[in-house]
A protein has these predicted regions:
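Extracellular "spike/adhesin" assembly and maturation modules
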Residues: 1-32
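C-terminal interaction-tip segments
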Residues: 2-14, 42-72, 84, 141-163
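Surface-exposed coil/turn segments at beta-strand junctions on protein surfaces, enriched
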Residues: 71-72, 117, 131-133
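Short beta-strand/loop motifs in extracellular/secreted proteins, especially
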Residues: 77, 88-92, 156
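Noncatalytic modules at the cell exterior or secretory-pathway interfaces
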Residues: 77-79, 129-147
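Short, surface-exposed beta-strand/strand-loop-strand elements in extracellular ectodomains
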Residues: 85-107
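Exposed aromatic-hydrophobic patches
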Residues: 120-129
Length: 163
């Protein structure tokens, strides 16, 4: 599913972030990191830029479910991912591409986030932002080196904040 980059006022994004963290039972540490630290830094150091909230759920590398969150370049300010309550390892991969996931060779992979325990969660904040030149495709595989898709039910849920 392709989602065009559509930036909006920061307050709307922060409302969505707050709702998502509560609905996914994010830990208090992640809530504080996003809702205080990142929000304050963007407001004071980046001039409160227009942002976009992008959610993903049950990520696999199936072409139907890989969310292409931006078909043009963008800057990622934050990622939150929470693994479903399964024993199967999931490696969330953030790819710098408008159309392709990393695959076995990982040519497009910029970030690999291991989610190895049921309900594992990770919050990552990028200051001054992680620049993605061509777009972002989110994928999940069973190993860090890649190639084997995460199956439905094992993939992580979460969101990104981009600008």
């Amino acid at each position: 599913m392709t989602v065009a980059k559509s930036l909006e006022g920061a307050n709307l994004v922060w409302q969505r972030v707050n709702k998502a963290l509560w609905s996914m039972s994010g830990s208090p540490v992640e809530k504080a990191a996003f809702l205080r630290t990142l929000k304050n830094w963007l407001a004071t150091q980046k001039g409160n830029p227009r942002l976009q909230y992008l959610s993903f759920s049950d990520v696999t590398t199936d072409a139907v479910t890989v969310p292409e969150v931006s078909a043009s370049g963008c800057t990622i300010y934050a990622i939150f991912a929470k693994k479903q309550n399964t024993a199967t390892d999931a490696y969330l991969k953030i790819n710098d591409s408008a159309t392709l996931a990393g695959g076995a060779n990982g040519a497009n992979v910029k970030i690999t986030i291991p989610l190895l325990v049921g309900n594992d969660e990770v919050a990552m904040i990028f200051q001054p932002g992680l620049i993605m030149a061509t777009g972002v495709v989110v994928a999940s595989e069973t190993t860090a080196a890649g190639g084997t898709d995460t199956t439905t039910g094992d993939g992580p849920n979460g969101f990104m904040i981009i600008g």
